[in-house]
């Protein structure tokens, strides 16, 4: 799984300096963080709607499709902020085995 994320991160990084008209990702970078966040918000809503539809229909294909879009645009956002998806994976690893209540209490105490 992480190989796919790493490969995608490399592509996203390579598009930062590309001409805006050379790719969709390059055009997002050139439009700036606000446009990237707008797309991320749109994808979040589309994922939620797909999940609600899947709960009724039992067909999760749109949920998978929309979640892929959500992850993709999340990675574009991270790259725009100079972050690699490994930082998110590291955070998930840190939380693994930690009760949600304990993790939340640790955040509140900081």
Swiss-Prot record:
One of its GO terms (biological process) is L-histidine biosynthetic process. GO terms for cellular component: cytoplasm. InterPro entries: HisE, PRib-ATP_PPHydrolase-like. Coiled coil: none annotated. Disulfide bonds: none annotated. Pathway: Amino-acid biosynthesis; L-histidine biosynthesis; L-histidine from 5-phospho-alpha-D-ribose 1-diphosphate: step 2/9. It catalyses: 1-(5-phospho-beta-D-ribosyl)-ATP + H2O = 1-(5-phospho-beta-D-ribosyl)-5'-AMP + diphosphate + H(+). This is Phosphoribosyl-ATP pyrophosphatase. Keywords: Amino-acid biosynthesis, ATP-binding, Cytoplasm, Histidine biosynthesis, Hydrolase, Nucleotide-binding. GO terms for molecular function: ATP binding; phosphoribosyl-ATP diphosphatase activity. Its EC number is 3.6.1.31. The lineage of its organism: Bacteria, Pseudomonadati, Pseudomonadota, Gammaproteobacteria, Pseudomonadales. It comes from Pseudomonas syringae pv. tomato (strain ATCC BAA-871 / DC3000). It comes from the Bacteria. Belongs to the PRA-PH family. It is an enzyme of class 3 (hydrolase). It is found in: Cytoplasm. NCBIfam families: histidine_hisI (TIGR03188), PRK00400.1-3 (NF001611).
């Amino acid at each position: 799984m992480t190989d796919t994320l790493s490969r995608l991160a490399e592509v996203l990084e390579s598009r930062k300096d590309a001409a805006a008209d050379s790719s969709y990702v390059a055009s997002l970078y050139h439009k700036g963080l606000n446009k990237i966040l707008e797309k991320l918000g749109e994808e979040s809503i589309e994922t939620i709607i797909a999940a609600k539809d899947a709960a009724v229909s039992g067909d999760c294909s749109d949920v998978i499709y929309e979640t892929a879009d959500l992850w993709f645009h999340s990675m574009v956002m991270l790259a725009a902020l100079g972050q690699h998806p490994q930082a998110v994976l590291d955070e998930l690893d840190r939380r693994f085995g930690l009760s949600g209540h304990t993790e939340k209490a640790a955040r509140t105490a900081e």
